[in-house]
Amino acid sequence: MAIDILHFFFIIKRDFHFRKDILLIMVTLDKIYHAAFVLKGVARKTDLIEAPTLSPDTHIYLKTENLQITGSFKVRGAYYKISQLTEEEKARGIIACSAGNHAQGVALAATRHGIHSVVCMPDGAPISKVESTKRLGAEVCLVKGTYDDAHDRAVELQQETGATFIHPYDDDEVIAGQGTIGLEILDQLADVDAVIVPIGGGGLISGVSFAIKSLNPNVKVYGVQAAGAPSMFNSTQHHHLETLSSVSTFADGIAVKTPGDITFNMVEKYVDAVVTVSEDEIAAAILALIEKQKLISEGAGAVAVAAAMFHKLPIEGKKVVCLVSGGNIDVNILSRVITRGLVMSGRNTNLMIALEDKPGQLQQVSEIIAACGGNVVSVHHDRGDTNMSISSCFLKIGLETRDHLQIMEIKQALTNAGFHLVSERV
């Protein structure tokens, strides 16, 4: 029988007027176990798979919440929260705000409980997430701006309608639902040394870290944010809650300006470190998951893998679980991410070469590239650039290559043949 651990957080809420000004937040291990019981038959116990090729000096395992029902972990917290509502709260209907994954979790949970739901989403949310939320039964209200703007609109609608608000992360029952992942990790890999978790508002890492630290305090728990949305990173660095003026990341699922009050306190208490990863590092992680593990991850879902791949944490030689939190990525974004990842790994490049505008030049360039093992995928002549003489042109050429070394060999061979490389462009 699990030992019940009770933690109290007195939180002053600034903007959630529809909740009490001072809240007694109770997150218990028993509540997480109860959430696991409630979620049986609803949320999958997702696989933990070994991924030895992602980081050769670390024993990496992937917790595949991207294969969860609705495509992300969010259904755990949303379903458990809604299951615990009173009949009166259910009768008022449900309102939520989300960049996409919480929206789908709320929609599924509300529909299964026979409750009308409205979800406010930023108008820049991926189309796939918006459409999936509608298919799962929710009414979607698109709001111009970011997640925080969608949140503000949800507050307004809650005031107008009296609906029950389901917060995406700053709620003890939502946190308990997400914490069931921590229980599963310890069950699937008892001798785990560290767990790396994505952070947006902090609900996922709060639940996971609480569960893991309660059962095995020796396991390290690390959080990762996108460098373009480092709200929790900044807050933990300065030991007080901070709000970003703006966010800039394609990892829309963790593009949050302000972490939760509850979650910030829990991260401060239970998380060993928070780090950030760049957009290019996230793109490289997504590409690695596709190629090496045959897994599709969204940007937010890949940040833990990015942190491991690019040595952001002291995990060499350790058994480490990277939580792949979601796989709901828009195919257009995925295409751009793959292209960026190929460029980063030296397998795609664009060269611009200054040529004399006469027959045979393109053939000679192509032969040099072929001799070096490169593959030409696109060619464009630019005769209109005013920086060139009338008798010259720019040749913009796209290549498929093996790696950065081969790109250097091609450039050197072209230079040796007398061609002038103006620049290399992505």
Residue positions per predicted region:
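PLP-dependent amino-acid enzyme catalytic core
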Residues: 23-426
